[in-house]
Amino acid sequence: MYGNHVLLRSLNPLAVARGDDIPDAVTIDGVSLSRGDILGAATSVAERVAQADRLAVLATPSVKTVLAVVGCLIAGVTIVPVPPDAGPAERAHILRDSGAQAWLGAAPDDTAGLQVLPVRQHARSWHSYPDPHPSSTAFVLYTSGTTGPPKGVLLSREAIAAGIDALAEAWQWTWKDTLVHGLPLFHVHGLILGLLGPLRVGSPVIHTGKPTPELYAAAGGSLYFGVPTVWSRVAADADSARALSGARLLVSGSAPLPVPVFEKLRELTGQAPVERYGMSETLITLSTRADGERRPGSVGLPVAGVDTRLVGEDGAVLPHDGDSIGALQVRGPMVFDGYLNNPEATAESFTADGWFDTGDVAVIEPDGFHRIVGRASTDLIKSGGYRVGAGEIETVLLGHATVDEVAVVGLPDEDLGQKIVAFVVGTGVEPTVLIDLVASELSNHKRPREIRVVDSLPRNAMGKVQKKQLS
């Protein structure tokens, strides 16, 4: 049962019975659970759900979510995490498409006619279950749906194990660490890395509920996860940032970390943050290493087992020269098994020779470091015959004192094809000054043709700017 391939290795009942337990394996919503607590309560959940195929979990940051997820993994039941803030249409789509048979743990007011199975924190069972096959589906994670209804990403147990192990090696992540984060538990970042990662590696995890600078500072961890919005707020709170100076790694992901935030964190904490890259379909495929260079604007090198390549519009593989911008394609053991009920989308996502097309465009340096330009659909702007990456323009603009946030997009233009437009949040913004700044720092054809000052930028639950809403 508990061989090398068991997903949640630190919950080995034999080892826990021998005394390999810790009182604070998971701390969430003000409650600390030991390994024994998690194992006993989650096995009780497993007994109640073992005959199910797929169950929906309303993924609140709570003990119920932790026990529901672990219980399903013990029983071999596929988990369908549902965002707590999902609207009626999105939630109905997820339930219908996934075929979830019931809610497990918490449930929304509108259960869509599905039964709600309880999760009891203090229930205990020590029944022994055979470990499910490594290739079996652990999760159906729904994408953000920027190109239509959300698609269900099929993630196997072995893909998750490979992804966590590769990051543990790159980050030198061990049982001696204490992970701190306050990320949502329905995405790869918060759920796979932020919950299953510690339960596989054996390190305690503290979920802060909300990822505020004050809560991060008070947690006293050695390893911190955050999205750029979180790190931007930490960098703006000097006292909280300095309180993290004793941490071993500050990891940023889910969106590009602005270079000014990178530099401010380095100044205040004494260490540069670690950046990584991934997506629901691939987990994390690129990362700066704990013992390697931390280069602003870069997401580092392929993790163990991952290969990458850049492909041009003509299908040719591009060189790693630091200049060529191409479609980023990846392959590795952590890549998903396809989209649920959508063989056409699955086929379109893979090349004939087996590479997954991420939909992102990137540049690879001669030394193998990767820089993500952005989404091919929104961040690669084709203006006046030039191919321009939105990210480098955003970096320049964020360096100006009047700019707090910025998103650069290409909007239709009869003359240029697309014109470069910058949406800026700031105080005392002077459009001509910003346009001239980009022209002088980069080149004239990369300058925004228009600066639009706005009160805020549209973002999703992970803090990613939703550029398709900007027009």
Which role fits each region the language model picked out?
Residues 309-329, 348, 366-367, 428-431, ...:
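Conserved beta-loop-beta connector loops within the AMP-binding
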